[in-house]
Regions:
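A general structural detector for well-ordered alpha-helical segments in enzyme core domains, enriched
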Residues: 76, 147-149, 172-176, 197-201, ...
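Active-site neighborhood of phospho(di)ester-bond hydrolases with catalytic His/Asp-centered motifs
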Residues: 23-24, 54-66, 86-89, 161-166, ...
Length: 256
């Protein structure tokens, strides 16, 4: 069984083969035009009970406030036990001072991701479970100097690809994905909307499932991404693999 649950924006919990991964799922800061993880969910995590508590792995693609808040990660770790934390490359080192101190004090295992652009590194998380971080350019002209990790999770033979904010205009950057059997590929609305993104999804990645995420909640969407996603859902549904659009708080998608 595979289940995906939205926390907010590009934050999801992936459940596969009895393991739970929180990917970009712990953030609540900044003035970005994307939804924060609601305080009521963070408070539930503080109880140490419920579906989001005691996740196996915390994974972060890059150090942007709509993907990663060190203080929220530390808060989570004070109330929950995890096997390992996989941190992004930092843009502002002082953001992590307290988190790194807590990781050291509590001897919580962690690794630093954030691969240089065009390089990749694989980590074995446990037998049969691997994470590969692939350094890519961040999408958007205003962020072209920044990098973002494209994350591959391999869970006992099932392959999941999290593209987060990785650039999708250079098809060759995804040559690593050609021919792999993808259980699910996670893309943002701009990736899904673009012609190059469509080619990647249809001809290169060819996943069983497409998950479109990084969509603001209703009332928190100044850029109109919800309307764009709805338009594209109608336009492309028949020509692409099974697609789910994560637009609502705690929305889930489950499949065998």
């Amino acid at each position: 069984m595979v289940r995906v649950t939205l926390t907010a924006s590009a934050g999801v919990m992936l459940e596969a083969d009895g393991l739970r991964f929180l990917v970009d799922a712990l953030h609540s800061e900044g003035e970005y035009p994307f939804s924060r993880v609601p305080e009521k969910l963070l408070a539930e995590m503080d109880t140490g009970r419920g579906p989001f508590c005691n996740a196996d792995y915390l994974v972060f693609t890059h150090d942007h406030p709509d993907h990663y808040t060190p203080q929220v990660v530390e808060r989570y770790l004070r109330h929950n036990r995890v096997r390992r934390v996989l941190l992004p490359r930092v843009q502002w080192a002082d953001r992590e001072t307290e988190l790194l101190r807590y990781l050291a004090e509590e001897a919580i295992p962690w690794w630093r991701l954030g691969m240089p652009r065009g390089t990749a590194h694989s980590y074995q998380l446990q037998p049969g479970v691997f994470l590969t971080a692939i350094g890519m350019q961040h999408t958007g002209a205003g962020f072209a100097e920044l990098d973002c990790d494209c994350i591959v999770l391999q869970v006992n033979g099932k392959n999941f690809l999290f593209t987060a904010d990785c650039d999708y205009l250079r098809r060759e950057a995804y040559s690593f994905a050609k021919g792999l059997p993808w259980e699910a590929v996670f893309v943002n609305p701009y990736f899904y909307h673009s012609g190059t993104g469509q080619v990647l999804l249809r001809d290169v990645l060819q996943p069983k499932h497409i998950v479109v995420y990084h969509i603001p909640f209703a009332g928190e969407d100044p850029m109109g991404l919800r309307a764009l996603a709805h338009q594209d859902q109608v336009k492309y549904a028949a020509s692409l693999p099974q697609t789910v659009f994560l637009t609502e708080y705690l929305q889930q998608s489950t499949w065998d």
